[in-house]
Amino acid sequence: MPKKVITDHSTGERKCRCFKRCGGCQLSESYSEQLARKQEKAARMLSGFGKVEDIVPMEVPYNYRCKVQTVFATDSSKRIISGVYQSNARKMVAVDDCMLEAEVASPIVQTIKVLMKDMRIRPYDLRTGEGLLRHTLIRTSFSTGQVMVVLVTASSMLPAKNNFVKALVKAHPEITTIVHNICPNGMPLTLGERSVVLYGKGYIEDELCGCRFRISPASFYQVNPIQTEKLYSFAVEAAGIRKGVKVIDAYCGTGTIGIICAKNGAEVTGVELNKSACRDAKVNAELNGLDNISFFNDDAGKFMQAMASRGDSFDVLVMDPPRAGASREFIGCAVKLAPEKIVYVSCSIETLERDLRIFKKEGYRATFIQPVDMFPHTMGIENVVCLEKFEKPADKAPEKVTVQEKQVFLKPRGRSVRKPVKNGTRRRK
């Protein structure tokens, strides 16, 4: 089996031969240089709001991805190959060993290729729509050692599935569950609505910050649990969580941050729009024996708006929005509710900067800014920012939204914003 990763034994640094073709890694310099690059970017974009702490590195910046998706194809010799889709394309890049993926994944994938050949299971071809196995999903818990394998097929028929499962588990006894997901159509690397458990319980469990979480095939869960534990610890500490503190966990996903807050004594309300994730959050709360946390399947902005109209109050808002950041409406409702602290967990430094600018104008100041290197060898930077309420001077008129800020919010909808004209007039053509 050809290796795709080269290790410099003098430094311990690894290099990937697929770097230019794959797209999984975006940075190829040494890890110390990567950290310096990310620190400079964080300081450049966020230092206007407060002191930016030193980025938190990963002790061993390899094999950190606990979620691994692999696609299959046949080469010119009709040999089954495995790999990933090229960045921003549907062309597959053959990869036998990835330095970012959990070490347990690659040997399992190699065995699956052998079984596909032996049992005449053809890889699915996106161009022709022929074949069966679309891709595999392998999820691993670094804390419990549990491993889930999901076989995603274009049809409900899986030839010799009992023999397939028996052979796979025999070769890899570390596998604790195998799930067959049926996805007859849809985009690459997506899951279908129907799943059948072939072996084990159909889920695995992971531990994070002293709490236990159930992970099913479609669960929302951070792909680097080692750094996630650090990230969430910073968030909980910044929030000043203690017994009796009222917390809103907006964009809560499967409830990870909120459950950790509740475990530390807070009274937590979680809000999540995705039904499946909200359902998982409730299961996770029960798994940890918590009765001081509740979850609502709702849009975070609308939920906050309803709270504001009722005159509700709480102490801390924890928000972990998607890459697009928070909506203007959400921020407006958050400010109206006026919590003492807002803890913003961000996966996009660009939208974080935009949102912090708005919070600042509304009387919130950053008291803590902590970047975390969640995804080594990529450009991604996660940040935890703690905002605290400061009274705005009574005689200060509210600042107007700039044209540039309007463009940030309106551009995705295809609307344009004209620049203001001096003296309030516009020349006719």
Residue ranges of predicted features:
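Rossmann-like S-adenosyl-L-methionine
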Residues: 2-9, 160-162, 166-429
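Nucleotide donor/acceptor-binding cores
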Residues: 66, 145-147, 244-245
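Extended interfacial segments that mediate partner engagement and assembly in macromolecular machines
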Residues: 9-12, 20-123, 138, 142-143, ...
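A short catalytic or substrate-binding loop motif that flags glycine-/basic-rich loops and adjacent residues
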Residues: 60-65, 74-76, 128-130, 198, ...
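Short, acidic/hydrophobic/Gly-rich beta-strand patch recurrent on exposed beta strands
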Residues: 83-86, 150-152, 281
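Short, aliphatic-rich beta-strand segments
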Residues: 138, 145-154, 212-216, 316
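Short helix/loop segment immediately N-terminal to the Walker
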Residues: 123-130, 247
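Polybasic, low-complexity RNA-engagement segments
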Residues: 24, 90-99, 144, 153, ...
